[in-house]
């Protein structure tokens, strides 16, 4: 049980009595960090959540934002870190299942999945095992339910060796007049439970996710990992949409963490209503299940529909059509109480608000020691450094991952994995760019700046496709919030993210917090995973690859002597230290807005765009050459900024920078850019040249490809 002594005392005072064992179990689940957000809620208030086009913000199963006059997009993101550490294949697969149900609950058809994954270095056998089976779990589940996995990111670092991070984002489309909510507003309506049968898997899943892992977790906590079934999920999806199309439902919610206890209490508490639940009506997968097990089970592929009693027969007929178990398991009441009955007796009677809205905890925050200066190193040859960066699993091609995913099912994917963002077709004219990004090293060494920079990088990725950000979702992965240094990291990171979002006027419409990512005293690098959706006309998509020889290369944004916390230091020198790049909120916005303006004004004259992030300008230009097979000549002295040597010029990770190629006259474009910028080179030839240093594009290609494949074949 994760209830603290003070929480138990609070509960006794609210009830005027001691809870019985079932009630204790229900309260334990709902007071868990995973369900209650009791530590994070005060901090999450920093986020801007309202803005043009926002239909539903935080607080429901997913956020919803307007995309066209008729269509909206539901977007959510979730973590499945602890389950994936224990059972990587099943943990990752059920993570996909959970986020799909969140999108379906809004009435939206899922059209895209994205994943953000973090593991230990691939030299470690256990890390390779976790990586292999997490990717297979994602691909098997996503491919079988027919939802494309279109983009993502992967990071490898020692701090994720014992505690991998598995975050999944999903986007879906829904007509604006068909959006559903997770509410139960009408007393007298009934709860229709449909989908998978309820078993013993996943019991205590949310409390398991609200504690640190230990050396014995792999054995002791395996029953807390849910068991997914993608075939049943496919049937649940189809049946759900048919029910929502044919029957007026007043509320829809999936059964995820906390099972029936969480789902029903949240449905009714939002409307100040109550619920009566009959355990005998619930379709079970196993015999002899206790009320405690039934109410806390997190068995997968289950949905609750709130509807009028006179529409039950129609809904049941649809469920029979798809061979799905279904039953009316209770009703909405006006009592404000969550009542559970078994064999005609009341066995639990709790205020719904007490379950769904536990009190917050004001955590202590303490600033840890952080680096204040740059790290002095002896720089190797430029060619050696660039090739080593390109052959690092953190930068090298992720083709081993995305080739396992079906990214073209549904035939919406316009720009496929491997670019700055994926682009999907919404209608004949409109597309959405989707990305997910994070910089855990910057956040570890400067939480405020790293949080802001993670939002900035995600926005740069959609801007580089020709889109403008509509909304942000986030998945915040941190250690134990009871430790003051960890909570300070979390608070400062959220402040930085919120400030960057506010600068762009881009609302945060949904999110997830995953605490307790610690094992045996090793805390993960704080990882604020940021998903961004941007809208763009389908006829103005940009991609990163060079398009032709003889085009001018422009850099937007200043490059500074900021090698601290860089991929260059981590990969080439084995150092994770130094002050990360500064975050200039206004400069980040001005650079993005300048890119938007020149795309709008000059259109096809802008032939390629790529953001600068891990590895700096050197890696960014190399990736553009590798993607196209076209070389380039770069004059590093023309790069705008204040660096002191070529390694700083090429590998600093200063924020707010883009690389563009343009055709025709460049002067007019430069004049339009009211930010630091310069023409730094020209495309052409079979080599990438930085001043008098040259590398054949074929050599860059070979360094960049086959890296992860080589590790995974050992």
Curated annotation (Swiss-Prot):
One GO term describing the cellular component: cytoplasm
Active-site positions on this chain: 34, 80 (proton acceptor)
Residues that bind ATP: 37, 474, 511
Binding, substrate: 79-82, 101, 226, 298-300, 514
Protein localization: Cytoplasm
Binding locations of Mg(2+) 2: 102, 254
Alphabetical UniProt keywords: ATP-binding, Cytoplasm, Ligase, Magnesium, Metal-binding, Nucleotide-binding, Purine biosynthesis
Any one biological process term the GO annotation gives: 'de novo' IMP biosynthetic process
Quaternary data: Monomer. Part of the FGAM synthase complex composed of 1 PurL, 1 PurQ and 2 PurS subunits.
Binding site residues for Mg(2+) 1: 78, 512
Name the record gives this protein: Phosphoribosylformylglycinamidine synthase subunit PurL
Annotated function: Part of the phosphoribosylformylglycinamidine synthase complex involved in the purines biosynthetic pathway. Catalyzes the ATP-dependent conversion of formylglycinamide ribonucleotide (FGAR) and glutamine to yield formylglycinamidine ribonucleotide (FGAM) and glutamate. The FGAM synthase complex is composed of three subunits. PurQ produces an ammonia molecule by converting glutamine to glutamate. PurL transfers the ammonia molecule to FGAR to form FGAM in an ATP-dependent manner.
Pathway participation: Purine metabolism; IMP biosynthesis via de novo pathway; 5-amino-1-(5-phospho-D-ribosyl)imidazole from N(2)-formyl-N(1)-(5-phospho-D-ribosyl)glycinamide: step 1/2
Catalysis: reaction(s): N(2)-formyl-N(1)-(5-phospho-beta-D-ribosyl)glycinamide + L-glutamine + ATP + H2O = 2-formamido-N(1)-(5-O-phospho-beta-D-ribosyl)acetamidine + L-glutamate + ADP + phosphate + H(+)
Superkingdom of origin: Archaea
Alphabetical list of Pfam families matching this protein: AIRS (PF00586), AIRS_C (PF02769), FGAR-AT_linker (PF18072)
An example Gene Ontology molecular-function term: ATP binding
Family per record: Belongs to the FGAMS family.
HAMAP family named among the record's database cross-references: PurL_2
EC number: 6.3.5.3
